[in-house]
Amino acid sequence: MLRTTLAPLVLALALALPAAAATPESWPTFGTQGTQFVRDGKPYQLLSGAIHFQRIPRAYWKDRLQKARALGLNTVETYVFWNLVEPQQGQFDFSGNNDVAAFVKEAAAQGLNVILRPGPYACAEWEAGGYPAWLFGKGNIRVRSRDPRFLAASQAYLDALAKQVQPLLNHNGGPIIAVQVENEYGSYADDHAYMADNRAMYVKAGFDKALLFTSDGADMLANGTLPDTLAVVNFAPGEAKSAFDKLIKFRPDQPRMVGEYWAGWFDHWGKPHAATDARQQAEEFEWILRQGHSANLYMFIGGTSFGFMNGANFQNNPSDHYAPQTTSYDYDAILDEAGHPTPKFALMRDAIARVTGVQPPALPAPITTTTLPATPLRESASLWDNLPTPIAIDTPQPMEQFGQDYGYILYRTTITGPRKGPLYLGDVRDVARVYVDQRPVGSVERRLQQVSLEVEIPAGQHTLDVLVENSGRINYGTRMADGRAGLVDPVLLDSQQLTGWQAFPLPMRTPDSIRGWTGKAVQGPAFHRGTLRIGTPTDTYLDMRAFGKGFAWANGVNLGRHWNIGPQTALYLRPSSARVTTRWWSSTWTMLHPSVRG
């Protein structure tokens, strides 16, 4: 979805706002008093917008926060995605785009309160709802449960996070005014002992003096809330009155807030781009504010699920199926993926101003964008020439068993023909391409509810390869409890189990080790690269319509997945990935043309 006007390219792969910005050390006190929030003891209405800082290039945090102020907001809400800050168990990374403390300080510098949502479960259309992949390699561990292994891992994460943000909590003079416990648990289960465990983990980590809260759908409040803990409600446009009626009936003596007012929606691969009614949302949002309720716009800006961080939906009803989300988290939000105001911006800004009577600050200067010339990809390298040392296994195992988190994995065995019949792969996680002697014979997609394909093996010995991509672990619904990726079932050919396999983990962490580059055409799964001089680094999109399915790097940074089934056709190139000389790599299973567009 190309949200900025850019030509195609050819590529290688209180009701009032705070009067002035306060410093964290002098931030006003915040709390609750009966049915009202209070700031320095005075009634205060939260006007909030969601910004997932890990989805926004750090260089643009200030710009997005200034635009939140320009909308008329006084607060921002953000998740912290556990899988980014603890990619390997016990190895925490709060640097760069994971620097939550720096984001909070920048919000404070712009005069904005911060609502922090650490999870550990986030949902957010994010890979596994934020759970790190290494969790799913621990046997039959049960996430979102009282499994001691899960609770211990969650506690370690919260302890590490608390050290980063302790000085920024409101009771320490900082702008973090509220901290969420878990996330929409009522839509998942109703184990109140588990929720109590979560609250206890927050207290133990050092959030004991913070204003803790839960958020749930209006019909799930009884399942996901805790006594003596603030409850907020989440809902879609058109549901405001009924949702608040239910919240007030459930908790009549507490402040009234919508924790997520869904001012947009997310996209799935192979489905149309979400387009929602901006005018209806602005009118309903104004109604919410006129009732004196507090509100959080979800999303103010969606941003991008860079790398392999998009999630997937799969609920547990008979009509549902696995549905991976796109790399772009545009969300049809107030700002588009690249931070440009959409038509919703003016409508929401005017609605807020009519209620508050306050004229918000002006928007910052527009972001500079660039149109790049067509650039051919002159070099290619076959995946078959870039396989790692194989691991011998009797039957296929999920990638977590090999210490792998994301990317692809190849399974290989030898078959003696002639053979013909259905090749059963089972519950593929998530897309499998099948090759006989490195020639493609078909695919099996979880998204399409496929479990097998017909194959014909000629006489003699032949190599069977099954290349599996993890397209995004489930982030919502009960099926997220099993987050394994790759092949998880025995492979059968005409009902006979195939044994004696090799596994080749392909996490695709960097293009630096790719070998066998050639200027000749390469068939099958391959890498393609080219170099482009772009001058001063600015925003642009890479038009990937010339490719089939794959992902792209720019100067070693994984920009995310592309897929010609849409609706997303272009990848956002953040300026930190663009240099005067930029080298593009694209890894594809199929390429439609010998050149690409950007």
Swiss-Prot record:
Residues 1-21 form the signal peptide. GO terms for biological process: carbohydrate metabolic process. It holds the Pfam family BetaGal_gal-bd. Its EC number is 3.2.1.23. SUPFAM superfamilies: (Trans)glycosidases, Galactose-binding domain-like. It is an enzyme of class 3 (hydrolase). Optimum pH is 4.5. Keywords: Glycosidase, Hydrolase, Signal. InterPro entries: B-gal_1-like, BetaGal1-like_ABD1, BetaGal_gal-bd, Galactose-bd-like_sf, Gly_Hdrlase_35_cat, Glyco_hydro_35_CS, Glycoside_Hdrlase_35, Glycoside_hydrolase_SF. It catalyses: Hydrolysis of terminal non-reducing beta-D-galactose residues in beta-D-galactosides. Disulfide bonds: none annotated. One of its GO terms (molecular function) is beta-galactosidase activity. The active site is at residues 184, 260. Belongs to the glycosyl hydrolase 35 family. Preferentially hydrolyzes beta(1->3) galactosyl linkages over beta(1->4) linkages. This is Beta-galactosidase. It comes from Xanthomonas manihotis. The lineage of its organism: Bacteria, Pseudomonadati, Pseudomonadota, Gammaproteobacteria, Lysobacterales.
